[in-house]
């Protein structure tokens, strides 16, 4: 695990974005941890989060021309990442997002920001079922651009209904590179290093043994 990944997980705990306990997921599974990126809800939180995304993206070596933020959660994430890439990594890239509802006045259309062209990196919080990513891929392709990857905050590294995770399915189905700031494996390593989280650590390890990929 890299330093920035450990710092990111500490930041998530500090802000209550990452919590331990018993949480029922949409899948019906009882998860020993919960991640809610919507709780990064101040200007400084969002700026710092953008820097973590930018770091992970830069270290991945992914080749892309612009960013796309899926409505709604992906919009501030793509904006914060675009700012961080420009300010800290010397990459001033265009970015774009979609509206959930097409506008019928003014400029109209369902896309806002830079025109979707070239190689596009999608920015979102997590991939659960992969539905939002599939919608984004359709939007990008319909505009004549090429989706090349997805950057997410946390990779839960767990199986979907079959043997593969939603992330593995997205990678295989669309040939997309998935970049994460941190993964479940990083979280477990972080918990071991931190100490004081032993009770939760056992539950997270048991969950990974049952549902992990």
Curated annotation (Swiss-Prot):
GO cellular component terms, A-Z: cytoplasm
UniProt keyword annotations, A-Z: Glycosyltransferase, Magnesium, Pyrimidine biosynthesis, Transferase
Residues holding orotate: 34-35, 128, 156
CDD domains: PRTases_typeI (cd06223)
GO molecular function: magnesium ion binding; orotate phosphoribosyltransferase activity
A biological process term (GO) from this entry: 'de novo' UMP biosynthetic process
Residues bound to 5-phospho-alpha-D-ribose 1-diphosphate: 26, 72-73, 99-100, 103, 105, 124-132
SUPFAM superfamilies: PRTase-like (SSF53271)
Signal peptide segment: none
The EC number(s) this enzyme carries: 2.4.2.10
Coiled-coil regions listed: none
Pathway, per record: Pyrimidine metabolism; UMP biosynthesis via de novo pathway; UMP from orotate: step 1/2
Enzyme class: transferase
InterPro entries assigned: OPRT (IPR023031), Or_phspho_trans_dom (IPR004467), PRibTrfase_dom (IPR000836), PRTase-like (IPR029057)
Pfam families reported for this sequence: Pribosyltran (PF00156)
Quaternary structure (record): Homodimer.
Record-linked HAMAP family: PyrE
Family in the record: Belongs to the purine/pyrimidine phosphoribosyltransferase family. PyrE subfamily.
Protein name, UniProt field: Orotate phosphoribosyltransferase
Lineage of origin: Bacteria, Pseudomonadati, Pseudomonadota, Gammaproteobacteria, Chromatiales
């Amino acid at each position: 695990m890299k330093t920035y990944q450990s710092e990111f997980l500490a930041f998530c705990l500090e802000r209550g974005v990452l919590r331990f306990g018993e949480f029922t997921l949409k899948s019906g599974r009882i998860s020993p941890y919960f991640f809610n990126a919507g709780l990064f809800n101040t200007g400084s939180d969002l700026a710092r989060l953008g820097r973590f995304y930018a770091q992970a993206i830069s270290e991945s070596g992914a080749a892309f021309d612009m960013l796309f933020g899926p409505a709604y959660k992906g919009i501030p994430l793509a904006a914060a990442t675009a700012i961080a890439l420009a300010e800290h990594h010397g990459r001033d890239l265009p970015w774009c997002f979609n509206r959930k509802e097409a506008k019928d006045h003014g400029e109209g259309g369902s896309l806002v920001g830079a025109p979707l062209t070239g190689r596009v990196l999608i920015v979102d919080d997590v991939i659960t079922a992969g539905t939002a990513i599939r919608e984004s891929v359709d939007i990008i392709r319909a505009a004549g651009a090429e989706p090349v990857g997805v950057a997410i905050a946390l990779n839960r590294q767990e199986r979907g209904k079959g043997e593969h995770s939603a992330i593995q399915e997205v990678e295989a189905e669309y040939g997309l590179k998935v970049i994460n700031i941190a993964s479940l494996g990083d979280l477990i390593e972080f918990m071991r290093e931190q100490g004081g989280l032993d009770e939760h650590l056992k539950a997270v390890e048991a969950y990974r043994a049952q549902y992990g990929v």
